[in-house]
A protein has these predicted regions:
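Active-site gating loops and adjacent loop-to-helix segments of metal-dependent hydrolytic enzymes
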Residues: 77-88, 128-155, 198-239, 279-303
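C-terminal cap of metal-dependent C-N hydrolases
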Residues: 3, 280, 338, 348-385
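His/Asp/Glu-enriched, well-ordered alpha-helical/loop segment
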Residues: 224-242, 258-270, 275-360
Length: 385
């Protein structure tokens, strides 16, 4: 594949990515043809690593919390076509019976050799009900080791779990998940500095959808207090993710997060619902409405989730927040791959990594996607120029 290439060391202006048997064989600054190889000419375009989506609830008209093989396949494929070659399906707050069903589906699909599904992400049900947002109130509870320990003893497919750190039992939960190598994030929280500092010490390493479902600087009577947002900024080593659709957060805040937390500590996430990459017009869930390019609660009490795919996030960061393209791409690929533990094979265009490749045109639209060395159906635009 010939074109302008983003490597871990920087840009190759006119180079080639050689792929074989699903892996990257070599990334070179030469665009000379290789004998016996099929050549994809992407000159004038940009070749970047496949994106790693570690917080998306659904897409293509299906929600991962449906916990069916059909829902997982359709939603994952919807995001794959937009460049997400590594996907961690996200469950909203639900019953443990449904979580076990989702685990069974996830484990099955992860065994398929070319599956983009890399593990499961759970958001809830251990959430502060005051900060529930669009989460299902009826499932919210405090952490119960009689629920989560048997689950995590049974499966290793759960790679991330987000809860409210101020709940009773939250610290024991985080200590246990950390012992299992599971990324644990604060979310839907009112925690202030001392609580965030204590949470970080026991294993909460990440802040989910930073700024959303958490307070910033605020007053109680005549006194002022730091919020969760400032507390996370002050906690060195705590990483963050932002819903960079340009709606959940304005461009100025996206730029602020980039400046203060940096590329190494910031991930781009969609937090997408079933409506992402969905061709229908009617809401799937009566609790929601689609308005102004985003999913809202029908009572206008809160944003419910985005309609974005990973390519939208990169375009937003570059075009609206004026972030350098290489940094925007890294926050959508290299950084999430490292934080969630798949950087040995995902997140970068380098020898030996999986051949997960996205080709973008000058407007940063996806022109072609390779997943494990194979062109994703429906994205073979370069073959029909």
């Amino acid at each position: 594949i010939n074109g302008r290439i983003l490597t871990p060391q920087g840009w190759l202006k006119d180079g080639s990515v050689l792929i074989c048997d699903g892996k990257i064989l070599e990334v070179t600054n030469s665009d000379l043809a290789v004998i016996g190889a099929t050549v994809i000419d992407a000159r004038g375009m940009t070749i970047v690593p496949g994106f790693v989506s570690m917080h998306a609830h659904g897409g293509g008209g299906h929600d991962f919390t449906e916990a069916t093989e059909e829902a997982f396949r359709i939603a994952a494929t919807a995001h794959l076509k937009h460049g997400a070659t590594g996907i961690f399906p996200t469950l909203s707050s639900t019953s443990f019976e449904r979580i076990y069903q989702a685990v069974d589906v996830c484990e099955k699909l992860m065994k398929e050799p070319e599956s983009p599904i890399l593990g499961l992400h759970i958001e809830g049900p251990y959430l502060n009900p005051k900060m529930a947002g669009s989460q299902y109130d009826g499932f919210l509870k405090t952490p119960d080791e009689n629920e989560y320990i048997p689950l995590l003893e049974r499966t290793s497919c759960i790679r991330r779990w987000d809860i409210s750190p101020e709940l009773p039992g939250a610290h024991d939960f985080a200590k246990y998940t950390r012992s299992k190598g599971i990324m644990t994030a604060v979310t839907h929280t009112e925690a202030e500095y001392d609580e965030i500092k204590a949470a970080f010490a026991v294993g909460f390493s990440h802040a989910a959808h930073f700024y959303n479902a958490m307070p910033g600087f605020h007053k109680r009577r005549e006194y002022k207090y730091e919020g969760t947002v400032e507390s996370v900024y002050l906690t060195d080593g705590m990483t963050v993710e932002v819903i960079a659709d340009g709606i959940h957060l304005p461009a100025t805040i996206l730029k602020l997060v980039y400046k203060l937390k940096g590329v190494e500590n910031t991930c781009l996430v969609t937090d997408a619902l079933a409506y992402a990459a969905y061709e229908g017009n009617e809401p799937i869930d009566p609790r929601y409405i689609i308005e102004d390019g985003v999913c809202k609660m029908a009572d206008h009490s809160a944003l419910a989730g985005s309609l974005a795919t990973m390519d939208v996030l990169v375009r937003t960061m570059v075009k609206k927040a004026n972030i350098p393209m290489e940094d925007a791409v890294r926050m959508a690929s290299e950084t999430p791959a490292r934080l969630i533990g798949v950087s040995d094979r995902k997140g970068a265009l380098a020898k030996g990594k999986d051949a997960d490749i996205v080709i973008l045109d000058k407007e940063l639209n996806v022109r072609c996607v390779w997943s494990m060395g194979k062109i994703v159906p429906g994205t073979d635009n370069l073959l029909h120029k």
